[in-house]
């Protein structure tokens, strides 16, 4: 359902009356497995989500994949947290999955301070 909603939302915002131009650029966020602000001494800046490959494929990737491939989303924002010990903004999934497997052609941006978190917060 999230993939369908994301696809239609993206098409509605990006597609204007003239097919030669993008009306707006939709940025999908937050890549990936971002769901914590502050809990038990962890914050979004230092949290490491431990996720299996199955959970990625079953839970986290489908909505992003559908919106990239069917909705032609032109932006993706990586999140503050790490996934399986790798900060999301430095994760090879940005190239191996997003660009190579799914054919994403748009831009990738970080959330505010997420790149600095790579060396300041993630150990």
Where do the PLM segments sit?
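Glycoside hydrolase catalytic-domain context in secreted enzymes
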Residues: 1-123
